[in-house]
Amino acid sequence: MKICSFMLFLLFFINKANAGSIEMDYSISLGNFYGYTDYSSSTPLKYKTNNLNSSLNAYTKLSYNINYDYKASLISYIMIDTAKEVENYNQGYWGEEFFAEFESPTGVFTVGQDYNVAYNFSVGAPNAGPIKINNTELTNFITNPNWYKKGSKSSYKTLNSTYINTDGASFKLNYVTPSVLNTKLGFSYIPNTNSSAGLVSKDSLYYNDEAYVFGLYNYFYLKDYEIETSLGYGNYKNNSEEYSLGMSIYRKGWTLGASYLKTSAQTKKALLTLQDAYREGHAYNLGLSYEIGPLTTGIAYFNSKSDKFSNQNEIISFSNSYKYNKYTTLSLTLAKQNAKDDKTTKGYATILGLEFAL
């Protein structure tokens, strides 16, 4: 309701007298995945070896073009998932982003449930298929004792991404400058960092504290190479300070990318514990992909570690996707994960995917 009121205020205040145009954009996708997992003999417990997962994703954007320079929009992303759970990990059966956006010559403003500017700017290892290397859906097929989320309860003993995503899609205010010399700057203010898509548990002492995030994005051409870079900084009050950087290089179908995230705990209000050890740690990824016609193939590596505890994750994935037509995409992912807690959980997964898009 607050977002809708804000949107109506913008439309009324900026262009009361002039009639503009309205446009709408949308997309809907349905993903169906089957994964077979083989756990090593050293894995202490017996987990599921056959996992099915279906997800429905919908995007809508309703825009009012006030004039050539000004546009106001309402944007939503909705996700419904049938099986985001392997033993102890559940990212949530429902997820959403909903925010208002205002574009002007002075920049882009958004208010609502959205990711922070550093996250939105981030570049790194490319995704060659539906199973991403950051905040990976691989956890739907191979259990990970370092990442736990169920309902309002969560525990992250290591980082699950090289992008700043501690606040997830919580309510926030974002501002992004116009592009100058192919460079954009951004700022996010987050009044409450708890989010079902983030890392902060509602049981923590700092879950309702504010945060500030800054981001920088740049792209340029060097002969035949297209190069993207990103930098991010986040200050989560009483929680952590976070620094991120990333780079992506593209040439003739090939994409090489890498990114890094470092966190340092702020312990004045809440001491670091094993359950939120991501607050003092680091993560990096590296990936290479190649796209030719309807086929994309790639390999990616992800590593995250707690600096104060022995917990660590290592993921290697080989992904392939084939766009059969404009509506249908087939995929095959082979992945390996080592998750070190008090014991080591090691698993191998083969994941088949069938996706439909409108």
Stretch-by-stretch model annotation:
Residues D209-S317:
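Detector for outer-membrane/organellar transmembrane beta-barrel domains
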Residues Y68-A72, T106-T110, L181-L185, L222-T229, ...:
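Repeated loop/turn-to-beta-strand initiation elements of outer-membrane beta-barrel proteins
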Residues S21, Y47-S55, Y89-Y93, I164-G168, ...:
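Transmembrane beta-barrel outer-membrane domains
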Residues S21-Y34, T49-N194, N208, N218-F220:
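Outer membrane beta-barrel
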Residues L30-D38, I66, S76-T82, Y115-V117, ...:
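Transmembrane beta-strands of outer-membrane beta-barrel pores
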Residues S104, F214, K346-L358:
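Outer-membrane beta-barrel "beta-signal"
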Residues Y59-K61, F99-E101, N174-V176, G215-Y217, ...:
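Outer-membrane beta-barrel architecture
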Residues I14-A19:
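Sec/Tat signal peptide C-region and signal peptidase I cleavage site
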